[in-house]
Curated annotation (Swiss-Prot):
It holds the Pfam family RasGEF_N. The lineage of its organism: Eukaryota, Metazoa, Chordata, Craniata, Vertebrata. Residues 1153-1170 have a biased composition (Basic and acidic residues). This is Son of sevenless homolog 2. Residues 442-546 form the PH domain.
């Protein structure tokens, strides 16, 4: 007989790296499909992945080779009706496969891995069928869990939510628990299993357990004890004290402990690894607050308690009293109450175990010391509890329901589910529904005698069933008999029976009766009174649980109505004014994951009230408010409002309070106590929490205003109260730390996993600062040092520098200093790259300079410095550089391809850049321009105030959108680069001043004139110029010298290799064009107009009307630009500042296109007189170069009759390009924008080919910035060109020109320091010698 295959161990040490996490991203997509409005945390998705792999193991156990084999396995192992649904879904997947893959789970990854699981290769359709079944089950689980989460008003699916919801679904639980591959690993019942949790999980679980424990204490006090207190004649005070001991002290302690833990979690700093709960236990332990547990244990475990209780319950009057309260209440008091009184005893031992677990998991030394102090302080109590327990030694058997009354802990629940399936397998003759389909919990088991039967019965009690079995004695060894241990005799559905207590008689003792609805009854008898009490306690608690729950809820509701929360009068405390549409509005049907309403708008007072609300804490609102409040409130005003909010007056005294005051006593009415506990304390605590967040994350407010800091310190020092002491000290500690950091400077001591790579040197050596330049420094080190500099600048930008577009306002130097530094650095670096190119007069030098810049771009890409990449793209697309056709055509093909791929990042609204940014791991330097664009669009497209019933409410929804963008910026500010700073290079790049003393207009004119000088218009060959450099132009390459130095990495991921040599590098050109446009940080406000508003022409407008008859000639990538209405939208280069009021019209740049031999031949017979003269033949003769646009022969002094025709385009795919839904959107006044990028080299739209009559003619005018749609013309260099010999070429017709004057450029808004010599005497290579 063939041996059954062994289950595949998916999570063994060997296999776990191959499988763990394989399905998580796909499962998230499944979750978003079944519940788009919810989210799921990582833990829950990993749990579902584990279940799916269990299911995969179950399917593979049958060794399937065909689809039919899998289908048969599903029919045999899946419960009904889920088997039919799963099969139908899988068959549908196979049918749809013919058209497309409809599945979200990664079939292509699972298919090759199944060979390892099965031991043989299976057909792809078999894998597809299996994956379809797995996806159906995962969707079913997520749908079920999502429904549960939605019903409890949560917004994130957790692992616990999945477990709880699956427990309620009998079909799923049966499918996963019917064999040994079920939830065994999740059903550890030992308390020590919680030790596997981390600190935060332990604290979170403890809060949930304390709340449940508090409800059980409320049940004892408010239901059972109130029943005793309701008849003072029947029960003496001594009777009540003996039964309930000091349970009120235990309740008070539990409320205090729960409040402390919740406050600690709420006040936990984001930088802390976990909440520091040790101080909560330490404070109470030092106060000996846990001592009441010793008294209660002594009273409840003593024999006197049981004797007194039994005597009391034996009195007929007592029985009648309890019976009159509610049906079954007498039995609940007699059997359930004694078990409930044991709950605090065992809960105290739970504290001892919890403190040890927290100490083992704590990552903070101070917290471990607090926990150790608490453990030491409780050692005497623990010794006393052990001594009392051993003295009275109550016997606890497996069936003894001493566990918490309402429900077993989650671990016990899972063990019970496992137990249910095991029990069913051990019962011979089982019929009907499975136990797991009608029960959720296993309660207890044990022997009972059925009156009238010969043999003893073994009873299994569940929350929905009671099963009576007869043991199979000695038959399991005989052939042909079942291996089950028990044989089914009776089943009782708990909701269909009544439990009746039976008094002891001579016929039977320790008996109870089960009476069904048809009046049939069965009597069971236990062996002792203790066993009977255990069975009755379990049966009565199950039967009357809902009754007792309703009684407790009714009491709690009544107390709340009788003791309303009284608040001060709105006349004396304006933060208690009732909510109305005139002071606050909320988002429609939108709540955060915690169920907290999201504020749309409100008055400042209402925003402050919700910021420190007494009913709940909203950390997201606190972060957003402190990031954005400066746009509607000054820091001094905010501090005043918070101090006013903190000083809460007492409410008007009641009559009882007035009477106590008249007697000279302190009023202590119940509603005043509630006011202090439920309003004053939480509000003041949350105000301190706001202060702590303010000084921790926005201390620059206090650095700019020392009076603000003095006011805060003065207020903090005046706060009194033991409950506030810890948080006041925390705030003072943060202030001291910030002051110290301010005095000492920012520390950059960062420890990396591996040492940074050594500094790379080329021609210039260490210490030769005066020789530093683009060609003398190593391209790797240029990219590294620029990346370090730009990363530092990026990481210093604060959210407050962005909110309200303050970098465009009058006080921008004060409000946005770091952002302006980054903008100016990027402008200078872009201009420096342009200057290096155009000042290289010699053609060979110029090609080498451009190649070197592209090498720097490659290293930028591998360092994830997207800002640097787009700086180079902007420089290459500038007017003065873009026109250098001969230079670009002399580049190596692979370098042109690298440049084209980089250019594609900025195309189509930066779609490929956004995809790339999402796919990489930090560290990185994102392109800041997109964030500034989105912030400006949000600021300009949404009003600052909302009109509600004639009132202006602060539009906080607008601030939240801006905060979301700044939050995305901040998520990339945390990870530094593992690189060394070279001080001289840092100083060199920080002091770059390519403009020297020239104005922006003068510098732009100089660059363009220089560009015309080195490559005149329509020249067939570039002019000859002598070389300036004496050193070799050969590049050192961009492969680091890791072999020589033993270095590892330029980043934490390893030093970049060239793009063309890196096999797994993502190619920007290979990203699918059909991908949906990313919406990272894009404003989503419905108020954002899709067309420019009326104010779009203002200086600060985001929406700039496109004017094809104007241009901007600056070379900064931060500047505004006027773009054509083309199919591809690009941000172009412009100025840091607003456009000139009357810009002159530059000439259009004729189109470029690649030379097509076939097209040339086909049109050879159509040559017109307008064509330029032919180039003289050379060896080998180059092909004829077509003019950029047809021009008339002769003197060019008249206008053309019509615009030139658009250039031929490259073949495009069958699918038409996307049509923009709205005009191009631009921003002005310092945001980042790009020059239009060269697309191999560039494309241009016909919109830019304007009638020459509209512009004057000037040979020295820089053309407008080209549009990125026309391919650059490919020049085929002759051998003489390749040897850089330049014979004189025949004249070519002049290019279309525009005005005799350059366009008027905007003035600068900041002053440049004259740190360099005059511009025109600066050579490209400072150490070069002019050849003679």
């Amino acid at each position: 007989m063939q041996q059954a295959p062994q289950p595949y161990e998916f999570f063994s040490e060997e296999n776990s790296p191959k499988w763990r996490g394989l399905l998580v991203s796909a499962l998230r997509k499944v979750q978003e499909q079944v519940h788009p409005t919810l989210s799921a945390n990582e833990e829950s998705l990993y749990y579902i992945e584990e279940l799916i792999f269990q299911l995969l193991n179950k399917l593979c156990m049958a060794q399937p080779r065909t689809v039919q084999d899998v289908e048969e396995r599903v029919q045999k192992t899946f419960p009904h009706p889920i088997d039919k649904w799963a099969i139908a879904d899988a068959q549908s997947a196979i049918e749809k496969r013919k058209r497309r893959n409809p599945l979200l789970l990664p079939v292509d990854k699972i298919h090759p891995s199944l060979k390892e699981v099965l031991g043989y290769k299976v057909d792809y359709h078999v894998s597809l069928y299996i994956v379809a079944v797995l996806e159906y089950i995962s969707a079913d689980i997520l749908k079920l869990a999502g429904n549960y989460v939605f019903n409890i008003r949560h917004y994130e699916i957790s692992q616990q939510d999945i477990k709880v919801s699956m427990c309620a679904d009998k079909v799923l639980m049966d499918m996963f628990d019917q064999d040994d591959i079920g939830l065994v690993s999740l059903c550890e019942d030992e308390p020590s299993s919680s030790g596997e949790l981390n600190y935060y999980d332990l604290v979170r679980t403890e809060i949930a357990e304390e709340r449940q424990y508090l409800r059980e204490l409320n049940m004892i006090i408010k239901v059972f004890r109130e029943a005793f207190l309701s008849d003072r004649k029947l029960f003496k005070p001594s009777d009540i004290e003996k039964i309930f001991s000091n349970i009120s002290d235990i309740h008070e302690l539990t409320v205090k402990l729960l409040g402390l833990i919740e406050d600690t979690v709420e006040m936990t700093d984001e930088s802390s690894p976990h909440p520091l709960a040790g101080s909560c236990f330490e404070d109470l332990a030092e106060e000996q607050a846990f001592d009441p547990y010793e008294t209660l244990s002594q009273d409840i475990l003593s024999p006197e308690f049981h004797e007194h209780f039994n005597k009391l319950m034996a009195r007929p009057a007592v029985a009648l009293h309890f019976q009159s309260i509610a049906d079954g209440f007498k039995e609940a008091v007699r059997y359930v109450l004694p078990r409930l009184m044991l709950v605090p005893v065992y809960h105290c031992w739970h504290y001892f175990e919890l403190l040890k677990q927290l100490k083992a998991c704590s990552e903070e030394q101070e917290d471990r010391e607090c926990l150790n102090q608490a453990i030491t302080a409780l050692m005497n109590l623990q010794g006393s509890m052990d001594r009392i327990y051993k003295q009275y030694s109550p016997r606890r058997r497996p069936g003894d329901p001493v566990c918490p009354f309402y429900s077993h802990q989650l671990r016990s629940k899972h063990l019970a589910i496992k137990k249910m399936n095991e029990i069913q397998k051990n019962i011979d003759g089982w019929e009907g529904k499975d136990i797991g389909q009608c029960c959720n919990e296993f309660i207890m088991e044990g022997p009972l005698t059925r009156i009238g039967a010969k043999h003893e019965r073994h009873i299994f009690l569940f929350d929905g069933l009671m099963i009576s079995c007869k043991p199979n004695h000695g038959q399991t060894r005989l052939p042909g008999y079942s291996s089950a241990e028990y044989r089914l005799k009776e089943k009782f559905v708990m909701r269909k029976i009544q439990i009746c207590d039976k008094e002891d008689t001579c016929e039977h003792k320790h008996a109870f009766e089960l009476v069904s609805k048809d009046e049939n009854s069965i009597i069971f008898a236990a062996k002792s009174a203790e066993e009977k009490n255990n069975w009755m306690a379990a049966l009565i608690s199950l039967h009357y649980r809902s009754t007792l729950d309703r009684m407790l809820d009714s009491v709690l509701l009544k107390e709340e109505n009788e003791q309303p929360l009284r608040l001060p009068s709105p006349e004396v405390y304006r933060f208690v004014v009732k909510d109305s549409e005139e002071n606050i509005v909320f988002e429609d049907n939108l709540q955060s994951r915690s169920g907290i309403p999201i504020i749309k708008g409100g008055t400042v007072v209402k925003l402050i009230e919700r910021l420190t609300y007494h009913m709940y804490a909203d950390p997201n609102f606190v972060r957003t408010f402190l990031t954005t409040y400066r746009s509607f409130c000054k820091p001094q005003e905010l501090l005043s409002l918070l101090i006013e909010r903190f000083e809460i007056p007492e409410p008007e005294p009641t009559d009882a309070d007035k009477l106590a005051i008249e007697k000279g006593e302190q009023p202590i009415s119940a509603d005043l106590k509630r006011f202090r506990k439920e309003y004053v304390q939480p509000v003041q605590l949350r105000i301190l929490n706001v202060f702590r967040h303010w000084v921790e994350h926005h201390f620059y407010d206090f650095e700019r205003d020392l009076e603000l800091l003095e006011r805060l310190e003065s207020f903090i020092s005046s706060v009194r109260g033991k409950a506030m002491k810890k948080w006041v000290e925390s705030i003072a500690k943060i202030i001291r730390r910030k002051k110290q950091a301010q005095a000492n400077g920012v520390s950059h001591n960062i420890t990396f996993e591996s040492p940074p790579p050594p500094i790379e040197w080329h021609i210039s050596k260490p210490g030769q600062f005066e020789t530093f330049d683009l060609m003398t420094l190593h391209p790797i080190e240029i990219a590294r040092q620029l990346t370090l500099l730009e990363s530092d600048l990026y990481r210093k930008v604060q959210p407050s520098e962005l909110v309200g577009s303050v970098w465009t306002k009058e006080d921008k130097e004060i409000n946005s200093p770091n952002l302006l530094k980054m903008i100016r650095h990027t402008t200078n670096l872009t201009l420096w790259f342009e200057k290096c190119i155009v000042e290289a007069e010699n053609f060979e030098e110029r090609v080498a300079v451009l190649s070197r810049i592209i090498e720097i771009l490659q290293v930028f890409q591998d360092l994830n410095n997207f800002n640097g990449v787009l700086e180079i793209v902007s420089a290459v697309n500038s007017v003065s550089v873009y026109r250098l056709d001969h230079t670009f055509e002399a580049l190596q093909e692979r370098k042109r391809k690298i440049l084209d791929e980089a250019v594609e990042l900025s195309q189509d609204h930066f779609k490929k850049y956004l995809v790339k940014l999402k796919s990489i791991n930090p560290p990185c330097v994102p392109f800041f321009g997109i964030y500034l664009t989105n912030i400006l669009k949000t600021e300009e497209g949404n009003n600052d105030f909302l009109k509600k019933k004639g009132k202006d409410l602060i539009n906080f929804s607008k601030r939240r959108k801006v905060a979301e963008i700044t939050g995305e910026i901040q998520q990339y500010q945390n990870q530094p680069y593992c690189l060394r700073i070279e001080p001289d290079m840092r100083r060199f790049f920080e002091n770059l001043n390519p403009m020297g003393s020239a104005s922006e207009k003068e510098f732009t004119d100089y660059l363009f004139n220089k560009s015309l000088e080195i490559e005149p218009r329509n020249c067939k060959q570039p002019p000859r110029f002598p070389r300036k450099s004496t050193f070799s132009l050969k590049s050192p390459g961009i492969r680091p010298n890791t072999g020589r130095h033993g270095s590892t990495s330029g980043t934490l991921r390893g030093h970049p290799t060239p793009l063309e040599r890196e096999p797994c590098k993502i190619s920007f050109s290979r990203i699918a064009e059909t991908e949906l446009e990313s919406t990272v940080s894009a404003p989503t406000s419905p108020n954002t107009p899709s067309t420019p508003p009326v104010s779009a022409s203002s200086d600060l407008s985001v929406f700039l009307d496109v004017d094809l008859n104007s241009s901007c000639g600056s070379n900064s990538i931060f500047a505004p630009v006027l773009l054509p209405h083309s199919k591809s939208f690009f941000s172009s280069c412009g100025s840091l500042h607003k456009l000139s009021e009357e810009p002159l019209i530059p000439p259009p740049l004729p189109p470029r296109k690649k030379f097509d031999h076939d097209a040339s031949n086909s049109k050879g017979n159509m040559k017109s007189d307008d064509d330029p003269p032919a180039i003289p033949p050379r060896q080998p003769p180059p092909p004829k170069v077509k003019p950029r646009v047809p021009v008339p022969t002769g003197a060019f002094d008249g206008p053309l009759h019509s615009p030139p025709p658009p250039p031929p385009r490259d073949p495009l795919p069958d699918t038409p390009p996307p049509v923009p839904l709205r005009p191009p959107e631009h921003f002005i006044n310092c945001p980042f924008n790009l020059q239009p990028p060269p697309l191999g080299h560039l494309h241009r739209d016909s919109d830019w080919l304007r009638d020459i009559s509209t512009c004057p003619n000037s040979p020295s005018t820089p053309p407008s910035t080209p549009s990125p749609r026309v391919p650059r013309r490919c020049y085929v260099l002759s051998s003489s060109q390749n040897n850089l010999a330049h014979p004189p070429a025949p004249p070519v017709p002049p290019r279309q020109n525009s005005s005799p004057h350059l366009p008027k450029l905007p003035p600068k808004t900041y002053k440049r320091e004259l740190s360099h010599p005059p511009l025109y005497r600066l050579p490209l290579l400072e150490n070069a010698e002019t050849p003679q």
